Curated annotation (Swiss-Prot):
Pfam families linked: CxxCxxCC (PF03692)
InterPro entries to which the protein is assigned, alphabetical: Puta_zinc/iron-chelating_dom, UCP006173
Protein name stated in the entry: UPF0260 protein Rpal_2074
Family the UniProt entry places it in: Belongs to the UPF0260 family.
Cited NCBIfam families: PRK05170.1-5, PRK05170.2-5
Length: 170
Protein backbone atom coordinates (compact mmCIF):
# COMPACT_ATOMS: atom_id res chain seq x y z
CA UNK A 1 0.00 0.00 0.00
CA UNK A 2 1.40 3.39 -0.92
CA UNK A 3 1.18 6.47 1.24
CA UNK A 4 -1.54 8.95 0.47
CA UNK A 5 -0.13 11.95 -1.43
CA UNK A 6 0.42 15.03 0.69
CA UNK A 7 -2.38 17.55 0.32
CA UNK A 8 -1.15 20.82 -1.19
CA UNK A 9 -0.94 23.71 1.25
CA UNK A 10 -1.89 27.30 0.47
CA UNK A 11 1.43 28.13 2.14
CA UNK A 12 3.49 26.11 -0.34
CA UNK A 13 6.15 28.33 -1.89
CA UNK A 14 6.66 30.56 1.15
CA UNK A 15 10.15 30.51 2.67
CA UNK A 16 9.07 28.51 5.72
CA UNK A 17 7.84 25.75 3.42
CA UNK A 18 10.78 25.75 1.02
CA UNK A 19 13.68 26.00 3.48
CA UNK A 20 14.79 24.09 6.52
CA UNK A 21 15.28 25.99 9.76
CA UNK A 22 19.02 25.80 9.14
CA UNK A 23 18.63 27.49 5.74
CA UNK A 24 16.71 30.52 7.00
CA UNK A 25 18.35 33.93 6.90
CA UNK A 26 18.51 35.81 10.22
CA UNK A 27 15.61 38.01 9.07
CA UNK A 28 13.50 35.00 8.10
CA UNK A 29 14.34 33.30 11.40
CA UNK A 30 13.26 36.31 13.44
CA UNK A 31 10.08 36.74 11.40
CA UNK A 32 8.97 33.23 12.38
CA UNK A 33 8.50 34.39 15.95
CA UNK A 34 4.80 35.18 16.28
CA UNK A 35 5.31 37.45 19.29
CA UNK A 36 3.27 35.36 21.73
CA UNK A 37 6.00 35.55 24.42
CA UNK A 38 5.00 32.20 25.91
CA UNK A 39 8.65 31.16 25.84
CA UNK A 40 9.41 34.18 28.06
CA UNK A 41 7.37 32.80 30.95
CA UNK A 42 9.20 31.23 33.86
CA UNK A 43 9.10 27.46 33.82
CA UNK A 44 9.71 24.85 36.49
CA UNK A 45 11.03 21.36 35.90
CA UNK A 46 10.09 18.42 38.08
CA UNK A 47 13.46 16.93 39.01
CA UNK A 48 12.04 13.41 39.23
CA UNK A 49 10.01 13.29 36.02
CA UNK A 50 11.55 16.03 33.88
CA UNK A 51 8.07 17.44 33.28
CA UNK A 52 7.99 21.17 32.58
CA UNK A 53 5.42 23.43 34.22
CA UNK A 54 4.68 26.93 32.97
CA UNK A 55 3.93 29.80 35.30
CA UNK A 56 2.25 33.13 34.65
CA UNK A 57 5.43 34.84 35.83
CA UNK A 58 7.42 36.62 33.15
CA UNK A 59 11.13 36.97 32.66
CA UNK A 60 12.51 40.15 34.20
CA UNK A 61 12.89 41.63 30.70
CA UNK A 62 9.41 40.72 29.44
CA UNK A 63 7.03 43.55 28.70
CA UNK A 64 3.80 41.63 29.23
CA UNK A 65 1.63 44.17 27.42
CA UNK A 66 3.82 44.38 24.33
CA UNK A 67 4.74 40.66 24.52
CA UNK A 68 8.31 41.62 23.78
CA UNK A 69 11.69 41.68 25.43
CA UNK A 70 12.69 45.05 26.84
CA UNK A 71 16.31 44.47 25.78
CA UNK A 72 16.23 41.84 23.04
CA UNK A 73 19.74 42.46 21.64
CA UNK A 74 21.33 42.05 25.10
CA UNK A 75 18.97 39.50 26.62
CA UNK A 76 21.53 36.73 26.95
CA UNK A 77 23.96 39.01 28.77
CA UNK A 78 21.29 40.30 31.14
CA UNK A 79 19.49 36.98 31.65
CA UNK A 80 22.10 34.20 31.47
CA UNK A 81 19.51 31.41 31.35
CA UNK A 82 17.60 33.02 28.47
CA UNK A 83 17.31 30.40 25.74
CA UNK A 84 18.36 31.58 22.30
CA UNK A 85 16.54 29.22 20.02
CA UNK A 86 18.50 27.36 17.39
CA UNK A 87 17.21 24.76 14.93
CA UNK A 88 18.70 22.04 17.14
CA UNK A 89 16.96 23.36 20.26
CA UNK A 90 13.64 23.74 18.43
CA UNK A 91 13.77 20.02 17.70
CA UNK A 92 14.88 19.04 21.21
CA UNK A 93 13.10 21.34 23.65
CA UNK A 94 9.92 19.81 24.98
CA UNK A 95 8.49 22.98 26.48
CA UNK A 96 7.92 25.01 23.33
CA UNK A 97 4.20 25.79 23.09
CA UNK A 98 2.13 23.91 20.50
CA UNK A 99 1.62 27.17 18.62
CA UNK A 100 5.34 27.87 18.21
CA UNK A 101 6.06 28.60 14.54
CA UNK A 102 9.61 27.28 14.84
CA UNK A 103 8.22 23.96 16.01
CA UNK A 104 5.51 23.94 13.33
CA UNK A 105 8.04 24.62 10.58
CA UNK A 106 10.44 21.98 11.93
CA UNK A 107 7.55 19.50 11.74
CA UNK A 108 6.60 20.56 8.19
CA UNK A 109 3.28 22.00 9.31
CA UNK A 110 1.52 25.19 8.20
CA UNK A 111 1.46 28.34 10.27
CA UNK A 112 -1.85 29.28 11.87
CA UNK A 113 -4.10 32.02 10.45
CA UNK A 114 -3.15 34.38 13.25
CA UNK A 115 0.59 34.25 12.63
CA UNK A 116 1.71 37.71 11.44
CA UNK A 117 3.34 36.18 8.34
CA UNK A 118 -0.08 34.84 7.33
CA UNK A 119 -2.42 37.56 8.60
CA UNK A 120 -0.15 40.51 7.84
CA UNK A 121 -1.16 41.89 11.23
CA UNK A 122 1.00 41.54 14.37
CA UNK A 123 -2.12 41.92 16.53
CA UNK A 124 -3.80 38.71 15.40
CA UNK A 125 -1.63 36.69 17.81
CA UNK A 126 -3.34 38.64 20.61
CA UNK A 127 -6.76 38.48 18.95
CA UNK A 128 -6.50 34.69 18.78
CA UNK A 129 -5.70 34.50 22.50
CA UNK A 130 -2.30 32.96 21.91
CA UNK A 131 -0.12 35.67 23.43
CA UNK A 132 0.62 36.31 27.08
CA UNK A 133 -0.93 39.79 26.90
CA UNK A 134 -3.02 40.38 30.00
CA UNK A 135 -1.97 37.07 31.55
CA UNK A 136 1.42 37.81 33.09
CA UNK A 137 0.87 38.29 36.81
CA UNK A 138 4.35 39.52 37.71
CA UNK A 139 7.97 39.23 36.70
CA UNK A 140 10.56 36.92 38.19
CA UNK A 141 12.06 39.81 40.15
CA UNK A 142 8.76 40.24 42.02
CA UNK A 143 8.23 36.59 42.99
CA UNK A 144 10.63 34.69 45.23
CA UNK A 145 11.81 31.54 43.46
CA UNK A 146 10.45 29.38 46.28
CA UNK A 147 6.95 30.75 45.52
CA UNK A 148 7.00 30.01 41.78
CA UNK A 149 5.13 26.74 42.37
CA UNK A 150 2.17 28.81 43.52
CA UNK A 151 2.02 30.38 40.05
CA UNK A 152 1.86 27.26 37.86
CA UNK A 153 -0.71 27.52 35.04
CA UNK A 154 -1.64 25.20 32.19
CA UNK A 155 -2.72 27.63 29.46
CA UNK A 156 0.74 28.25 27.91
CA UNK A 157 0.95 24.59 26.91
CA UNK A 158 -2.49 24.68 25.26
CA UNK A 159 -3.81 26.17 22.05
CA UNK A 160 -6.96 28.31 22.46
CA UNK A 161 -10.01 27.18 20.48
CA UNK A 162 -10.17 30.33 18.35
CA UNK A 163 -6.50 29.89 17.47
CA UNK A 164 -7.29 26.47 15.99
CA UNK A 165 -9.77 27.87 13.48
CA UNK A 166 -8.84 27.61 9.81
CA UNK A 167 -9.27 31.34 9.30
CA UNK A 168 -9.78 34.60 11.14
CA UNK A 169 -13.25 34.81 12.69
CA UNK A 170 -15.45 37.50 11.20
Amino acid sequence: MTARPKKPSPQDGFFWKTKTLEQLSPTEWESLCDGCARCCLEKLEDEDTGRIYFTHVGCRLLDGDACACRDYPNRSDRVPDCVRLTPKEVRELTWLPPSCAYKLVADGRDLYWWHPLISGDPNTVHEAGVSVRGRVERTETEIPVEELEDHIVSWPALLPKRAKLKQRPR
